[in-house]
Regions:
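Charged, glycine-rich active-site and insertion segments that engage polyanionic ligands
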Residues: 1-99, 103, 110-117, 122-178
Length: 178
């Protein structure tokens, strides 16, 4: 037998993660519950969510800015937004687009008012409360495809300024779809 063998570790139960977060990190029950659900049995991911410098917070800010500027049809500031995003490294840009797809899905699921379907932090949910009504059956697939296509272009070494500005302009059109 080979010495390099795969060993599967079982996920930690969400209740155990929640309990550990309350005991070891002194979190309140609601926050611990949210983080445990998002982590899905991964203690390292739970600790990552606690980190205030978490990359997801920056991605959330960029997502909020994109959606607000697109809703206001502010082309000039969308151009600036795309230039800022273009300064990120390619891998970070791809992670950001993955995060955008996550927020899109969570915003759509928020419309169903089923908390067990939602995997959002408190900050994400605070934004989704008002934003979710703009994501519906008429536009979710097209916006998701747009983010996926943009990620593909970035991976293929396309000019990020052009990719992100084009994406931002298309989001304007897709957000107004009912």
């Amino acid at each position: 037998r080979s010495r390099a063998q795969r060993i599967d570790f079982k996920k930690i139960d969400n209740e155990e993660v929640k309990k550990a977060l309350i005991e070891r990190r002194l979190l309140d029950e609601n926050t611990a519950h949210r983080i445990a659900r998002i982590a899905g049995g991964n203690w390292n991911l739970a600790l990552e969510e606690l980190d205030s410098g978490n990359e997801n917070r920056q991605h959330l800010d960029m997502f909020i800015m994109l959606m607000r500027l697109a809703y206001m049809r502010n082309i000039h500031d969308l151009k600036k937004w795309s230039e800022v995003v273009a300064t990120f490294g390619r891998e970070k840009q791809k992670r950001m687009l993955d995060y955008f797809m996550h927020m899109l899905r969570e915003s759509f699921m928020y419309n169903f008012r089923q908390p067990e379907l939602s995997y959002m932090t408190q900050d994400e949910e605070d934004f989704a409360k008002n934003f979710a009504r703009f994501i519906n059956e008429a536009n979710i697939i097209d916006i998701s495809d747009l983010f996926e296509e943009s990620k593909k272009f970035i991976a293929q070494n396309a000019n990020p300024k052009i990719v992100f500005f084009d994406m931002a302009l298309k989001v304007i059109v897709l957000l107004i779809r009912k």
